[in-house]
Amino acid sequence: MKTLILSCNTGGGHNTAGRALLEELNRRDLPAEMLDALSFGRKHTSRIVSQSYISVASVTPKLFGGIYHLGDFISSSHRKSPVYLANAHYAETLHRYIVENGFDTVLCPHLFPAEELTWARKKLGGTYKFYMVATDYTCIPFTEETEPDAFFIPHADLIPEYEEKGVPRDKLLVTGIPVSRRFPEHMEKAAARQALNLSRSAHICLMMTGSMGFGDILPLPEKLCAAEADVQVIVLTGSNAEMRKRLAERYGSSGRVIALPFTDRVADYMAACDVMLSKPGGLTSTEAAALNVPLIHTDPIPGCETRNAAFFQEHGMSLRATGTEEIAQTAASLLYNAPLQQAMIQAQAKTINAYAARDAIDLALERCSSPGV
């Protein structure tokens, strides 16, 4: 099996899922490549689309939510959307690349390449198989107008939602959301703290702002530290250099508040913390659950993140809080509530498949060797 993974730079989660799948393929020494699906468009297509997404989602989240819900409203299996038509413009170039390079399997942890390949196979044929890999705990708008060989979805409880949108039941395969093995196969807390040079005795609260540093979190560390004397707050600010600078200016070098840039050691910081605060992105939430971290979801970007937060809360895998005061109070309560932490960890272990990447590749391999499937 030779695999092409197609993602997009509209948020870090899609690429993170893609890299988890690539990691699993590399473990098995299977030929694989990961590309930006929008790179097959015009020269600046990827940059323009990605920057527009980030700008709308971070600067005007209510507008983003309105656009999402409008998409949900007009989404239908009976007609093609403007999203489908826009992606069709560069589908032929992508199709040619797949055929010329001998890929027999394509994995799409993003809607856009699934739209492209739906058009390409209808108009141009092709013997390769492609799969859409969901990265949120909901059926996102326009999923039903794509026609992959199968949909790899996060949980069996989402099957009715997909069916209601018009996705055929026999195409729904429950795998979970792919995350790196670094999360389920993490260091113990004491070892992680030693490796990161963190306090062994402090109650550590990890604040995740997402790959793009969403959220006005400046006052929150102060509230968290005020709750108890032994609380230490670590803020992973993603690519938001301005946020990191403002945190450093406000909290100095006391050591109680540590602001860090983008890091490839997220799993280690999660393993080291006692409680994690995060916006409810599908990937970050799944990584936390795969690592069994007590989790508090903060203000979501309206749309699929709202659904993610609801799914986690309904399954006992997280708490939810909004606003600085409520978030600080909820975090302080959870930090010192061992029974609630344990109940949350047990719910995460019961609900989340930490080895979804492995299972997705197993299914793709099985179907690659069975032409009729």
Locations of regions flagged by a protein language model:
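A donor-sugar binding/catalytic signature common to diverse glycosyltransferases
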Residues: 268-307
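A short, well-ordered alpha-helix in the C-terminal region of glycosyltransferases
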Residues: 340-354
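C-terminal alpha-helical cap of glycosyltransferases
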Residues: 354-373
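C-terminal "capping" alpha-helix adjacent to the active site of nucleotide-linked donor transferases
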Residues: 313-316, 323-339
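Conserved N-terminal ligand/cofactor-binding loop architecture of enzyme catalytic domains
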Residues: 20-100
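A nucleotide-sugar donor-handling region in carbohydrate enzymes
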Residues: 149-204, 208-211
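Donor-nucleotide binding loops and adjacent catalytic segments primarily
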Residues: 189-194, 198-273
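Active-site and donor-binding regions of nucleotide-sugar-utilizing enzymes
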Residues: 12, 17, 69-166, 171-174
